[in-house]
C-alpha cells in the first residue's frame, strides 16, 4: 500500500519536517521554544490581520482607531491585547531559544544560527515599528529617539534620518510607512523561519550533551508533537492570564496619551524586551559609540562560533562556563532593570559596569574559561 503522506509532493515536505523526522531521544523542554515561536508568529499574524481591518495609519485618526477597536469592535479589546502581549511572549520565547543555543553550542550549525540572528533583527524591527502605530506619547517619542540614532552615522546620517521620516520630523509619512513595513515584515519572518528550519533539517537537531545523536533517533511524531502541544498549551495559558487579568502590566501608561510633538514625556523608554539594549546605548556618553554598542550587543551573536574555543560543544559538562553563562543572564537582567530607570546616580554607573561586563563575558571570559576547561580535561 502506497502511503500518500510519504508520496504526495506537498504532504511529503510536511511529513519529513514534522512527522517522520528523526529527532534525538534526549532533547529537553529547552527545545520546545522553536515550535512556540512558530505559534507566536501565527498568532501575531492572525491578530494583526484583524487589527489592520479596523486600524487607520493616519496621524489624525490612528489613536482614535485603536480606541475604537477596543470599545466598539466585537472582541476588539481581546484581539488588541493578545497582539500587544503576544509580542512579549514572542520575545520571552526568543530569548529562551537564543539562550538555549548559546548554552548547548547550537551555534555550530552556522547557516541555521546566522539565519536565526537575522530573524532576531527582523523581529526587533517589526516590534519597534508596531509600537509606533497606536500613536501615543511613547509611540511618537520612541520613534523620534530611535530613528534619530541613525543621524550618528558620519556624513550621510542626517539625510538618512530625513529619508526614513519622509520629512523633517516623525509625522504622517513616517506612520504610514511604518504600518506598511509592520504589515509585510512578519511574512518575511515566516519565510526566513522556513529557511531556518530547512537548514536545521540538513544537520538534524542538537541535543543537551552536544554529542552526535545519530545512533539513537526517534520519530518526531508522536513523541515531540505531544511535547510541543503541552508547551503550546502552557504558552497560551500564560498569554491569556496576562491578557485577561493585567493586559497593561508590560505597557507604558504614557501611551494612553495621544502623541504630542510639543510635550516630551519625562522618561522615554522602549518596551521591556528592548531595555537591555537601550541600557547599553545609554551607558556610552557618545552618540556614535552608543549606537555602535547597541548594534554590536546583538550582532555579537554572529561571532559566537568564532569565540567557541572548547573541545566540547555543549556546556553540559563544563561547570566554569556554566557559571559564566548564568552570570551573563544575571547581567542581562540587570541591564533590563537599568534601561527602565532614569539617567541619574547610581543607575548610570551600574549601567556602565553591566555593559562592560556583558562584552567582557562574551568576548574574553567565556572563551578563556573554555580554554582552561580544555586543559583541565588532560588528566
From Swiss-Prot:
Function: Component of the ubiquinol-cytochrome c reductase complex (complex III or cytochrome b-c1 complex) that is part of the mitochondrial respiratory chain. The b-c1 complex mediates electron transfer from ubiquinol to cytochrome c. Contributes to the generation of a proton gradient across the mitochondrial membrane that is then used for ATP synthesis.
Molecular-function GO terms, alphabetical: metal ion binding; ubiquinol-cytochrome-c reductase activity
Extra remark beyond the main annotation: Heme 1 (or BL or b562) is low-potential and absorbs at about 562 nm, and heme 2 (or BH or b566) is high-potential and absorbs at about 566 nm.
Name the UniProt record assigns to this protein: Cytochrome b
Gene: MT-CYB
Family the entry assigns: Belongs to the cytochrome b family.
Listed GO CC annotations: mitochondrial inner membrane; respiratory chain complex III
Subunit architecture: The cytochrome bc1 complex contains 11 subunits: 3 respiratory subunits (MT-CYB, CYC1 and UQCRFS1), 2 core proteins (UQCRC1 and UQCRC2) and 6 low-molecular weight proteins (UQCRH/QCR6, UQCRB/QCR7, UQCRQ/QCR8, UQCR10/QCR9, UQCR11/QCR10 and a cleavage product of UQCRFS1). This cytochrome bc1 complex then forms a dimer.
Recorded superkingdom: Eukaryota
Residue sites binding heme b b562 per the record: 83, 182
Cofactor binding: number and manner: Binds 2 heme b groups non-covalently.
Species of provenance: Gazella subgutturosa (Goitred gazelle)
Residue stretches spanning the membrane: 33-53, 77-98, 113-133, 178-198, 226-246, 288-308, 320-340, 347-367
